[in-house]
């Protein structure tokens, strides 16, 4: 989600330069992207392994280095909530004195039409209809309001008043200063702004290390996402002191080691005198001074070797993982994410996303409720069959992988059915959502293993059911020999009756229609909402078409 305007680019570059950051502007150009918003393009051919952005961690913005870091720490606020509150204070109360304000002011919580950037879970009811019935709605329930964000707003408002009462700290105007006179209306307006801040920062945050956690990184957030072939990798040393951010030994680690030694000493026979077992503050300070001298020498050597470049462990880098040709847009990646996750967290969608799926859980439930003949089979599947089939199928896939590619791949299976088994373990065997969530079609139009299995099960004749999976036929259904004999039948993909059942189910599936007059009637939908909804819905329509062709 690009929420940086073209006019802001010079401010960002100036901020990075003032922080002694290094951006290869001789090789890279920030300009408008065909994908929308801004992007970063290669001015010349750039080789794999080159770092095109290097920033000291002191120049990024996190809750841990913000103007209210101590207050957040004392209040035990961390994670994204801490970053959201810190951003609000930094851009309002401390804007005139903040080191980061020249950068933070370029992060917009409104689009180019002036509308707040809101996640679909907080769209107005008529706009939510744009995604009704899609996987966004039925599988992930992402149209339901997120209670965590609303609770976060309550916490932020309470803290703002507490800090104001105790320290005289100004309450951020326009964000956390909820009016008592017109409470409900003003509360809702401020809540929406808080949600927009949270959504915007979520789309731009990078995981830095144990100290900074998620932070805002200038320039790094301007690179657009590529689904399958990103050009960049984000490099940052994560294992640092979570109290001060030091990558090497610090007073906190010294104290921890001392406590560990003291605890160990308590369990040892008491043969030494107290003088040999007690460490005092003077000794700790002496050790710290020795460490500082040693660190200064190491830093000096690094600067001599690297021409003045700072300690790499204290920097973040964007490094090319492949060659980039002149004129090519340089892409980052937010991960292997479907449009559902991209829209829910980052505010954009990608046409023909290879990680999209179409969820069929509610569609199966419709036919299961209509047909009495399916009830015994569904009961068996939900209570016993799905768990057995998932475990058996995963084992078969693992054996196939080992036979084809050796033992190495057995530890890194990527088949969808394994995730089914993991979710089964997490949610419990009796969870209705557990097996319904595994009924889907992938982006290529291929039904999931559980979808084929349930379709094959439902189309069994009475005689087949009695002989294969009924209680009479399988008194010891959990026996592995029985599983190996019976369960392979459910994995078949050439059963004409199953194909017909699936074809009918897909033809009856209802997805939103976002064309012409239909979308124009939704007055609360912004241009961005309509565009993202169209992309997501069209992707699901395309998947259904591919699947129908496979089944025909």
UniProtKB/Swiss-Prot annotation:
Location within or outside the cell: Nucleus
Any GO BP annotation: methylation
EC number: 2.1.1.-
Keyword tags: Methyltransferase, Nucleus, S-adenosyl-L-methionine, Transferase
Ranges annotated as biased composition (Acidic residues): 413-432
GO molecular function, one term: protein-lysine N-methyltransferase activity
Top-rank taxon, per record: Eukaryota
Chain sites annotated for binding S-adenosyl-L-methionine: 334
Top-level EC class: transferase
One term under GO cellular component: cytosol
Main location group: nucleus
SET domain residues: 26-335
Location of region: Disordered: 399-432
Listed InterPro entries: SET_dom, SET_dom_sf, SETD3_SETD6_MTase
UniProt similarity note: Belongs to the class V-like SAM-binding methyltransferase superfamily.
Other observations noted: Present with 7880 molecules/cell in log phase SD medium.
Protein function: S-adenosyl-L-methionine-dependent protein-lysine N-methyltransferase that monomethylates 60S ribosomal protein L42 (RPL42A and RPL42B) at 'Lys-40'.
Protein name per UniProt: Ribosomal lysine N-methyltransferase 3
Organism for this UniProt entry: Saccharomyces cerevisiae (strain ATCC 204508 / S288c) (Baker's yeast)
């Amino acid at each position: 989600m690009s929420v940086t305007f073209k006019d802001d680019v010079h401010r960002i570059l100036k901020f990075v330069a003032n922080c002694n950051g290094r951006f290869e502007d001789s090789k890279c150009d920030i300009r408008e992207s065909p994908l929308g918003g801004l992007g970063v393009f290669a001015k010349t051919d750039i080789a794999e392994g080159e770092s095109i952005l290097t920033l000291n961690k002191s120049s990024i913005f996190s809750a841990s280095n913000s103007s209210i870091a101590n207050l957040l720490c004392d209040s035990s606020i961390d994670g994204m909530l801490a970053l959201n509150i810190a951003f609000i204070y930094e851009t309002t109360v401390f804007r005139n004195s903040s080191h980061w304000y020249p950068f933070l002011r370029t992060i917009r919580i409104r689009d180019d039409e002036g509308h707040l950037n809101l996640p679909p879970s907080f769209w107005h009811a008529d706009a939510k209809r744009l995604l009704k019935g899609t996987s966004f709605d039925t599988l992930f329930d992402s149209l339901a309001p997120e209670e965590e964000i609303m609770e976060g707003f309550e916490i932020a408002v309470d803290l703002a008043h507490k800090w104001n009462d105790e320290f005289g700290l100004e309450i951020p105007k326009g964000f956390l200063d909820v009016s008592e006179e017109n409470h409900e209306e003003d509360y809702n307006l401020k809540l929406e702004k808080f949600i927009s801040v949270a959504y915007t920062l979520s789309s731009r945050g990078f995981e830095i290390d144990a100290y900074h956690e998620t932070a805002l990184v200038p320039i790094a957030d301007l690179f657009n996402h590529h689904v399958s072939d990103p050009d960049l990798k984000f490099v940052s040393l994560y294992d640092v002191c979570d109290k001060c951010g030091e990558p090497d030994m610090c007073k906190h680690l010294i104290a921890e080691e001392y406590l560990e030694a003291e605890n160990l000493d308590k369990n040892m026979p008491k043969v030494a005198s107290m003088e040999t077992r007690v460490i005092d503050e003077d000794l700790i300070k002496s050790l710290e001074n020795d460490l500082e001298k040693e660190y200064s020498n190491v830093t000096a050597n690094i600067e001599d070797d690297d021409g003045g470049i700072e300690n790499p462990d204290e920097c973040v880098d964007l490094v090319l993982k492949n060659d980039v040709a002149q004129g090519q847009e340089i892409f980052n990646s937010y991960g292997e994410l479907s449009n559902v996750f991209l829209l829910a967290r980052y505010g954009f969608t990608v046409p023909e996303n290879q990680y999209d799926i179409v969820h069929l859980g509610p569609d199966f439930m419709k036919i299961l409720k209509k047909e009495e003949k399916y009830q015994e089979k569904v009961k068996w599947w939900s209570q016993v069959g799905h768990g057995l089939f998932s475990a058996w199928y995963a084992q078969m896939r693992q054996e196939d992988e080992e036979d084809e590619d050796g033992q190495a791949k057995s530890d890194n299976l990527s088949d969808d059915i394994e995730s089914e088994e993991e979710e089964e373990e997490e949610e419990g065997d009796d969870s209705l959502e557990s097996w319904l969530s595994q009924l889907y079609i992938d982006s290529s139009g291929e039904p999931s293993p559980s979808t084929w299995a349930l379709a094959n099960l439902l189309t069994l004749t009475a005689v087949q059911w009695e002989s294969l999976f009924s209680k009479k036929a399988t008194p010891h259904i959990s026996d592995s020999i029985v599983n190996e004999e019976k369960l392979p039948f459910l994995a078949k993909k050439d059963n004409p009756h199953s194909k017909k059942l699936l074809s009918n189910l897909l033809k009856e599936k209802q997805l939103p229609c976002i064309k012409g007059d239909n979308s124009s009637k939704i007055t609360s939908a912004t241009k961005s909402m309509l565009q993202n909804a169209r992309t997501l819905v069209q992707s699901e329509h395309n998947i259904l078409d591919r699947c129908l062709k496979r089944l025909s």
